[in-house]
């Protein structure tokens, strides 16, 4: 987490596993240890950073104090704190919601009040097995301070507002499809989440995300073809028209040239957040050609983060 903050990332992610009342952090069940809890790796460090950023002024009294975020040079910039539910959503939710209480009590969580978004230093977004009906429920989310990671692949909107997306996978021989790990891909059959893209609004969702490899398909000869580009544009367009932040995960990570090519194309097409696990590679890129994208807030979401 600290390396992500130091690099200027405005999004961090924790994979959580619920066992009893405890929430453990790790990429797989075999990586879990007793001290690697959500509280130890994320809640307490975030609370400590934000408390230090919000010490009352000692010289001149601020008559209109506002909460400062994590970044000293950009105090109004919120940090997205994505929580990826790895265990069953409805039983994981209570422990997760309770774990946020110290941050909630300090007023650090962005929330919805009377139909209006109240911006605060942190934006909590549930993904993975997070149940959408809990996010939208006043019973389960009474403070309305946990948002959803909406399905970007449902958001396609063409330039002429058509909603029927082109099928990128149909443009290549079946023999070119490569086997891939699908264990982290959640389908609508697994969770009773809405298939109507208009169900996801800024009042219940923040990101709209999808697997790049699943939604866009194989990159033949390392190139994004025109149909795939139209899919990317349409999904980004549809998310942004609905007030959500477009994000692709599971982008190619090797070879480096292909990874950089995909990053460039996504930024060029207006993606809101770039999903990275190579912080050094992302921060060393020259983003000046892309409309000041990097300097507009460093919209990088770090994945594969174990908290430190």
Can you describe what each PLM-predicted range is?
Residues 1-16, 22:
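General structural concept
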Residues 6, 21-308:
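Catalytic cores of phosphodiester-bond hydrolases, prominently lipid phosphodiesterases
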